[in-house]
């Protein structure tokens, strides 16, 4: 009996020790992995939010799953499964994601994806010189992937949408004049063009237009991981309120923002009627206004 009591006390003591404390594990995909600037930002956001909440929630670890990027629909399927491959994914918000997963309505890129430049064929530049309004832009053919958040928005707004079945084929289709332009985030378009310069020397960035399309970029959490959702919400809130997120944004994308010279462009606003009522548009400090912001934090 005495030996049993000693064993019981030993077990209780060890279970209460830090070695046995709960560890929150985030499972995410390679689209969040630090293999380029854009994906490094996603990874750092997750890691910083977890680090900031250690005093309240304890230890954590991040496990990256899979061998490469995964289509968004498959990522959502895994997010919804019990013990699926992912329990956290960062993507532009879409109604299906908000309905089925747990959205954390804090725009982790502070609306940077709201601003879109147009990748086009050099032979089309004269056409864009005549575009000054949404009405004159609508008839032109826009190339999109159906999985993108912009697809549903632009369809609803009456754009002439042409579907591309993969990310890479978008550029070859544009080169063959299958459509007139691809709208890309201002932090995406320069690297995309640079990496394809040899393959598609006729592709250029249209120099005079910027589309403004509200596109919040959220962290989505599995409905089977409510504690992770609570922890990330707390961490992201601290990052936003303390200016950490804004500083991180400029560290990663400041060079692209300077190169964009967005203030010299004609602006075309596009409504996003797919946004939910929970979108924090009233929290002005959650969003970066590139028309009225300095290029330093």
What function would you assign to each model-found segment?
Residues 67-137:
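Acidic, polar ligand-binding/catalytic clefts
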Residues 32, 112-117, 121-124, 198-230, ...:
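Periplasmic-binding protein-like
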Residues 21-99, 232:
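Extracytoplasmic small-molecule ligand-binding "clamshell" domains
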Residues 80, 87-100, 182-202:
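A ligand-binding cleft/hinge motif common to bilobed small-molecule-binding domains
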Residues 35-51, 118-158, 170, 187:
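Bilobed "Venus flytrap"/periplasmic-binding protein-like clamshell domains
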Residues 16-18:
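N-terminal signal peptide c-region/cleavage motif recognized by signal peptidases
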Residues 65-86, 156, 168-188:
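Short helices/loops that flank or line small-molecule/ion binding pockets
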Residues 145, 149-156, 236-296:
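Ligand-binding clefts/hinges and TM-proximal coupling segments of bilobed small-molecule sensing domains
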């Amino acid at each position: 009996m005495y030996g049993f009591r000693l064993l019981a006390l030993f077990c209780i003591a060890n279970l209460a020790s830090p070695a046995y404390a709960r560890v929150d594990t985030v499972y995410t995909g390679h689209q969040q992995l630090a293999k380029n600037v854009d994906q490094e930002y996603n990874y750092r956001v997750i890691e910083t939010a977890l680090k900031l909440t250690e005093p309240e929630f304890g230890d954590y670890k991040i496990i990256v799953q899979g061998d490469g990027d995964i289509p968004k629909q498959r990522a959502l399927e895994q997010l919804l499964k019990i013990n699926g491959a992912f329990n956290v994914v960062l993507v532009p918000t879409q109604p299906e994601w908000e309905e089925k997963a747990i959205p954390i309505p804090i725009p982790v890129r502070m609306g940077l994806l709201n601003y879109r430049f147009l990748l086009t064929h050099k032979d089309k530049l004269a056409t864009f010189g005549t575009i000054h309004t949404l009405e004159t832009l609508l008839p032109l053919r826009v190339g999109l992937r159906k999985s993108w958040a912009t697809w549903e928005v632009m369809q609803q707004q009456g754009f002439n949408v042409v579907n591309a079945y993969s990310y890479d084929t978008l550029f070859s289709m544009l080169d063959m004049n299958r459509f007139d332009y691809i709208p890309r985030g201002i932090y995406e378009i320069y690297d995309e063009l640079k990496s394809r310069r040899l393959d598609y020397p006729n592709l250029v960035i249209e120099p005079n237009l910027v589309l403004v399309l509200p596109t919040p970029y959220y962290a989505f959490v599995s409905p089977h991981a409510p504690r992770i959702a609570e922890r990330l919400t707390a961490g992201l809130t601290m990052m936003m309120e303390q200016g950490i997120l804004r500083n991180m944004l400029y560290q990663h994308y400041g060079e692209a923002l300077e190169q964009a010279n967005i203030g010299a462009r004609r602006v075309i606003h596009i409504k996003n009627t797919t946004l939910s009522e929970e979108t924090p548009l009233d929290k002005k400090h959650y969003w970066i206004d590139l028309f009225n912001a300095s290029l330093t934090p």
